[in-house]
Amino acid sequence: MVEYNRIFCVLVIFSTTIKCEYSELMNQKIGVRVEVLNMIYENETTITSTGHPRCRLTLHKSGWDRDTCSSPQFKLNDTLSWSTRVCYKWVCDTTKYAMRVESCWIGSPNMSVYILRDDGCTIEKAILTSPVYTSFNRAAAIGWMAVRQKNMKYMHVGCTIRLCHLCDPKCQTITPPRTCNDNRADDYEAMWNSSSRVKNLCFPEPSTTENLNLNFGNSPFQNVGNIIILLLVFLLR
């Protein structure tokens, strides 16, 4: 049985002994395991031609700086209590694509509780905040591992990453999400409008070499050479 953000207490009376299963779950410390990220690509053809970006989710110890998750990362043998603050950090190693974190869950693979919707916004703020995007390929959120299953040893965490190319006009409407009611829509619009990465990748200026070739092709020396060739042809006729 999974306990999710509500009080559930079964009282079993043996003479004068009262056993509260909820209390046991609350006091239980468990390990955490991050599942392999599920990747979704908006344009398979573009992704195939440029290679698949590598993305990862890391969990960090409690800290209030959710924009960077600057606290140390949890180690394999660390355990978490019900009230442990956790910073989720998502990173994709790419300069050509933007990511959106969506459909995240915690619990066990067979009995999971979703904490992010498929639009990238939180389902329950008491469990996880909506991710904050500091760039097109980095996001972070603060949450608690407030899900317990009886006899659970490890809490599993899984997420989906949706990738779109920065030059795809639809990409700007996909990520970062503007519908999460986190007062960051204006920041995300500015991220797109002022991005030098998008400008250089999608609207590159002509290179210096191209300019030199263009100027040389229109130079007066070339015109003089053409005139001389015409005169020689005329005299030899």
Swiss-Prot record:
Its main location: Golgi. The keyword Signal applies. The keyword Signal applies. It comes from the Eukaryota. It is found in: Golgi apparatus, trans-Golgi network. Keywords: Golgi apparatus, Signal. Expression detected in motor neurons. GO terms for cellular component: Golgi apparatus. Residues 1-20 form the signal peptide. Interacts with vps-51 and vps-52. PANTHER family: CUTICLIN-LIKE PROTEIN 19 (PTHR22907:SF59), GH04558P (PTHR22907). This is Cuticlin-like protein 19. It comes from Caenorhabditis elegans. The lineage of its organism: Eukaryota, Metazoa, Ecdysozoa, Nematoda, Chromadorea.
